[in-house]
């Protein structure tokens, strides 16, 4: 046991002893729930922070505040609530009473204070402790010196402590909430209807990914946590809801990384009588508007770069992007779609670039891997990548001029994918054959290939109007808006391996 752990255990024991000793003389077993706050810290700072000491004395304003003690500075207590911090002042008689009633207060304790608002000699607002009540005794101490929790793993495992002591973390999740609200409001103004579709699927579909499998006891059958809501949302378009969206969780049984969490949030939407170009225009409008609304500017810092959401955004085909970011590779510079269709050529090219290939990869998969290894990470500014091959886009409509590719794009910022959209495949027979090709791929060893969904084919046979649909990764978008570089910093409780 380390010295630090021993010290912490000693403090915990001392605090437990304090709580045990004060319980008999406190109401509600020392956990009262009768105190009512009248003002938050930020409200008082905003309304009275500019007043002079004399003005506040003359005003004689009384208030009730409540929050967690974050520091003790002589007779002053720094109290933190959801909005910010404010001080409370304990004159000598109050200090003696606190010691008598509660054996003194500790950092981390939650208290309620009622009294007159004053201004200190240093110009800080404070509430005189005329009435006060210990609301919750903190049995565990906050991190050393309260300069913030810096151990990354502890921050994620004990997010509650991280939020108490790290203002930056609190603000990141406030921004996340604002981003989601702004997206929702934008979609509603565009006449999209918010819907909810199943989280447990009989057949996993809507994306190429490995699902989580569970078991429904009453029905005695396996079920899958959804990897995407796509097929259910398109069923709604078949049913006549022409503009729908959903903000919810997806689950993919895959690895962890700075940009991947097995449980993540997506906003997915579908609009009838539109194509993938309309989606790109809508995405530009959405992102530029919420950036200006939330940050006051279409430009924002991201690491060493400045990302400009103002638009128009760059648009390149996947082949064009590979050629742009491999200027010195003569083979790539001369590459045509006819060569992209040549499996042996694509395998040799991938190997020459140091890419470890799988035997079941198609031409489209090889092209996507080459793009991912050589071009994707260089897409710092908002960029739409189009021209995705049909064999890696089983739900997307084929391009009218080049059937090898589809009317699909992925949207990149900061070197990572943030959104995926396409004109939907509404040809039931083509969808049937592509589902069958996915089944063949799964049989060949691709465990991320899709299942065959007969009911979805039946839905398409009733007629899906020309439709475009898109998914936007909320977590990755929030990473941009908060200038953070790991997805765990924007997910309140990220997936973690259990502690030994």
UniProtKB/Swiss-Prot annotation:
One of its GO terms (molecular function) is magnesium ion binding. It catalyses: tRNA(Lys) + L-lysine + ATP = L-lysyl-tRNA(Lys) + AMP + diphosphate. One of its GO terms (cellular component) is cytosol. The keyword Acyltransferase does not apply. Binds 3 Mg(2+) ions per subunit. Signal peptide: none annotated. It holds the Pfam family tRNA_anti-codon. It is found in: Cytoplasm. Its cofactor is Mg(2+). Keywords: Aminoacyl-tRNA synthetase, ATP-binding, Cytoplasm, Ligase, Magnesium, Metal-binding, Nucleotide-binding, Protein biosynthesis. It comes from the Bacteria. Mg(2+) 1 binds at residues 410, 417. Its EC number is 6.1.1.6. GO terms for biological process: lysyl-tRNA aminoacylation. Mg(2+) 2 binds at residue 417. Its main location: cytoplasm. Belongs to the class-II aminoacyl-tRNA synthetase family. Homodimer. PANTHER family: LYSINE--TRNA LIGASE, CHLOROPLASTIC_MITOCHONDRIAL, LYSYL-TRNA SYNTHETASE. This is Lysine--tRNA ligase. It comes from Shewanella sp. (strain W3-18-1).
């Amino acid at each position: 046991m380390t010295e630090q752990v021993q010290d912490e255990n000693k403090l915990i024991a001392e605090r437990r002893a304090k709580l045990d000793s004060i319980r008999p003389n406190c109401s509600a077993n020392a956990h009262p729930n009768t105190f009512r706050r009248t003002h938050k810290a930020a409200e008082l700072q905003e309304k009275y922070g500019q007043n002079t000491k004399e003005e506040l004395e003359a005003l004689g304003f009384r208030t009730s505040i409540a929050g967690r003690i974050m520091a003790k500075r002589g007779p002053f207590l720094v109290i933190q609530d959801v909005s910010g911090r404010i001080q409370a002042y304990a004159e000598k008689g109050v200090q003696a009473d606190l010691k008598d009633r509660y054996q003194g207060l500790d950092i981390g304790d939650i208290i309620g204070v009622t009294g007159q608002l004053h201004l200190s000699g240093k110009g800080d607002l404070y509430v005189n402790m005329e009435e006060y009540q210990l609301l919750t005794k903190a049995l565990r101490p906050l991190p050393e010196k309260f300069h913030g929790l810096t151990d990354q793993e502890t921050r994620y495992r004990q997010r509650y402590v991280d939020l108490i002591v790290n203002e930056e973390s609190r603000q990141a999740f406030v921004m996340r909430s604002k981003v989601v609200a702004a997206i929702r409001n934008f979609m509603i103004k565009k006449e999209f209807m918010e819907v909810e579709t199943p989280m447990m699927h009989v057949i996993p579909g809507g994306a190429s990914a490995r699902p989580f499998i569970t078991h429904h006891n009453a029905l005695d059958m396996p079920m899958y946590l959804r990897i995407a809501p796509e097929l259910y949302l398109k069923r709604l378009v078949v049913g006549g809801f022409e503009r729908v969206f959903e903000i919810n969780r997806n689950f993919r049984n895959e690895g962890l990384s700075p940009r991947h969490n097995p449980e993540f949030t997506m906003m997915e939407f579908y609009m009838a009588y539109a194509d993938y170009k309309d989606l790109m225009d809508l995405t530009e409008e959405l992102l530029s508007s919420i950036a200006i609304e939330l940050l006051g500017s279409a430009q924002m810092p991201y690491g060493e770069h400045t990302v400009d959401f103002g638009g128009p955004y760059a648009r390149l085909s996947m082949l064009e992007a590979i050629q742009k970011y491999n200027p010195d590779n003569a083979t790539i510079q001369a590459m045509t779609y006819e060569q992209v269709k040549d499996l042996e050529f694509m395998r040799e090219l991938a190997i020459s670039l140091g890419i470890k290939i799988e035997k079941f990869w198609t031409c489209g998969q090889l092209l996507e891997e080459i793009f991912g290894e050589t071009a994707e990470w260089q897409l710092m500014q908002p960029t739409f990548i189009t021209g995705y091959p049909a064999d890696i886009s089983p739900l997307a409509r084929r391009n009218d001029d080049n059937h090898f590719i589809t009317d699909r794009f992925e949207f990149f910022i900061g070197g990572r994918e943030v959104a995926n959209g396409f004109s939907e495949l509404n040809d039931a027979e083509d969808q049937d054959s592509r589902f069958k090709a996915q089944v063949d791929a799964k049989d060949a060893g691709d465990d991320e290939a899709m299942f065959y969904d007969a009911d979805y084919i039946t839905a398409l046979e009733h007629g899906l109007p020309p439709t475009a649909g898109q998914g936007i990764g909320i977590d990755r978008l929030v990473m941009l808006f908060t200038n953070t570089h790991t997805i765990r910093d924007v997910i309140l409780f990220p997936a973690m391996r259990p502690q030994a």
